[in-house]
Amino acid sequence: LYEINGAGMLFKSNFQMLASLKAGNINQFALTDGTNHFDNKETLSTLSNLLENISATTPPIEVDRYASPTDRLLSFNILRKIRKDVTLKGNIGYSYAKSQYDYSLTRSYADADNNVIIAQEYSPLSTIHRPSIQLEYKDNSEKTYLSNTLSSTGSFLTSELPTKENGSLFNQKQTMREFYVNNKFSTLWHHKDLCWAVTSIMSYQGSPMGKITLNKETTDNVVQNANGRSF
């Protein structure tokens, strides 16, 4: 078991940068610690709602006690002073999360004639790659205020769920590719005795690939495909 944390800083008169790295296999942190500092709103696509994530029965204990994670988190935060009242902030991040475990479950049901025993074994494995970038441009001059924030996040998920039930083996596999782009613009200025303001928010969510495949020894494969987009 291991956990590694590292950070580096660079400071100049008009530029600052903070880089951080975290890696470990003790607990899961990459997806929760990879925070969007400018837009904390969580987004869930139509495709995620439709297909959801394949999952198995889990042990009745905390996830950190049975899951075997491998997490990586890399982040760069920058601040650039372009002019006296103009700044550019940025965050570039990458999260990688892998989780796997083995779990077996046996149930016994009694009726008037005999006992029915259902024995199941699960070996879930999932990996997620999640890159992200956020940029914030701000002009806070005396007569004009302008702000523009651009955020983008991608998610690349692959998961498998091999299952053995009373000696019969089948496997579910899921692949999902999604991305999200959001831009928020606002400006305010004074002209004579009037104050003018303009605000614009645009967002796009794309899910070009969503696929679930069920492989079973005794039957043909079952495949479910979906994709979607929203504005």
Label each PLM-derived region with a short phrase.
Residues 102-103, 210-231:
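Short, intrinsically disordered, charge-balanced linker/junction segments flanking boundaries
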Residues 1-158, 172-206:
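Membrane-proximal, glycine/serine-rich, low-complexity loop/turn segments characteristic
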Residues 160-164, 212-214:
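Short, tandemly repeated low-complexity microdomains enriched for cysteine and small residues
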Residues 108-117, 165-170, 216-223:
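Flexible, solvent-exposed loop segments that connect beta-strands
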